[in-house]
């Protein structure tokens, strides 16, 4: 009997040690990170959907009923506008309002700043180097998704980010049967906005997280610039196991497991490309799409006055698996 008690006590202590060693998942305890799939963020910084997470007095953000409380700015943070000014935004996305660009007049600095207020950890976590790299990485990845540049384009190919708004060609409806995220009649879930979010199973949880019904109104991502930026920031800040969030990677919070190291997934910009589209672009040696992302990143780091860091490529990384965007590329 004493042995049983000792074993039970040991198990309990081991569980508590594991819990204490785990990093919080959301809210002010996690740099303003948001819970995935519409889960509530508890006052202690954990994601869930029971009363302990969502109930009055227990929920700090993404709570049911009413507006989402804004977590306080995390330590080491600060005003996003002090890192990227309106003039820098215009310099980075120099040709976004070119007459040839579908997104002319849509993507604005004010819309970006307003959207970022819903994700207070973005661009405000860590030291100045981490903050600048996050902004450079976010705009590099989204610029690749929306680029209108070409090799001999005026000012170079990396001055043409945010040219496109909707997926080009003749996209399908991207509707996958789902009981949780059912497709609305007549709606299409092709790529839209900075990150080109696609599929009903992404529009659904994204809409829930930002407080908009995107299943019934997917084109809000292409008609409301604040919602458009929020869709990209939601993707950026949201982890999808086994993948970390892009945010956690670029600020240095993510630490690779033994499995990640065996797959050559080491902290740096390359892992973010793996998160976004690793199934098609990573582990293939030199890939022009990966190099395009890196080209944008290097340019934006130069404008922001920060070094790009290490591990920019994913050519020798094994993929995490299918990304949110893999079927749209």
From Swiss-Prot:
Disulfide bonds: 26-41, 35-47, 40-54, 59-63, 101-163, 175-183, 282-314
Intracellular or extracellular location(s): Vacuole
Keywords, sorted A to Z: Carbohydrate metabolism, Chitin degradation, Chitin-binding, Disulfide bond, Glycosidase, Hydrolase, Hydroxylation, Plant defense, Polysaccharide degradation, Signal, Vacuole
Description of post-translational modifications: The 4-hydroxyproline residues are not glycosylated in this plant vacuolar protein.
Domain Chitin-binding type-1: residue ranges: 24-65
Inducing factors: By ethylene.
SMART domains: ChtBD1
Active site: 145 (proton donor)
Catalytic activity: Random endo-hydrolysis of N-acetyl-beta-D-glucosaminide (1->4)-beta-linkages in chitin and chitodextrins
Entry GO terms, CC: vacuole
Ion transport in keyword set: no
Molecular function per GO: chitin binding; chitinase activity; endochitinase activity
Source organism superkingdom: Eukaryota
Name of protein: Endochitinase A
């Amino acid at each position: 009997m004493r042995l049983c008690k000792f074993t039970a006590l040991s198990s309990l202590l081991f569980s508590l040690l594991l819990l204490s060693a785990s990093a919080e998942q959301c809210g002010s305890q996690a740099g303003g990170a948001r819970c995935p799939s519409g889960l509530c963020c508890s006052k202690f910084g954990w994601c869930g959907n029971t009363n302990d997470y969502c109930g009055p007095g227990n929920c700090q953000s993404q709570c049911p009923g009413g507006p989402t409380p804004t977590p306080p700015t995390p330590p080491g943070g600060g005003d996003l506008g002090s890192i990227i000014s309106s003039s820098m935004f215009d310099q980075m996305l120099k040709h976004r309002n070119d007459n040839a660009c579908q997104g002319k007049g849509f993507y604005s600095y004010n819309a970006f700043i307003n959207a970022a207020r819903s994700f207070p950890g973005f661009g405000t976590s860590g030291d100045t180097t981490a903050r600048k790299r996050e902004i450079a990485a976010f705009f590099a990845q989204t610029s690749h998704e929306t680029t209108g540049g070409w090799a001999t384009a005026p000012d170079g190919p990396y001055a043409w980010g945010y040219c496109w708004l909707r997926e080009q060609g003749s996209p399908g409806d991207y509707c996958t049967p789902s009981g949780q995220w059912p497709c609305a009649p007549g709606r299409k879930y092709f790529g839209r906005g900075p990150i080109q979010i696609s599929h009903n199973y992404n529009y659904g949880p994204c809409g829930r997280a930002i407080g908009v019904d995107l299943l019934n109104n997917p084109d809000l991502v292409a008609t409301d610039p604040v919602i458009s930026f929020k869709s990209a920031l939601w993707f950026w800040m949201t982890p999808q196991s086994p993948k970390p969030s892009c945010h956690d990677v670029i600020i240095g919070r993510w630490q690779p497991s033994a499995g990640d190291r065996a797959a050559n997934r080491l902290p740096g910009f390359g892992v973010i490309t793996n998160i976004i589209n690793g199934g098609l672009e990573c582990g293939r040696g030199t890939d022009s799409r990966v190099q395009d992302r890196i080209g944008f990143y290097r340019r934006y780091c130069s404008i922001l006055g920060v070094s790009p860091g290490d591990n920019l490529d994913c050519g020798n990384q094994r993929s995490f698996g299918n990304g949110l965007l893999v079927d749209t590329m």
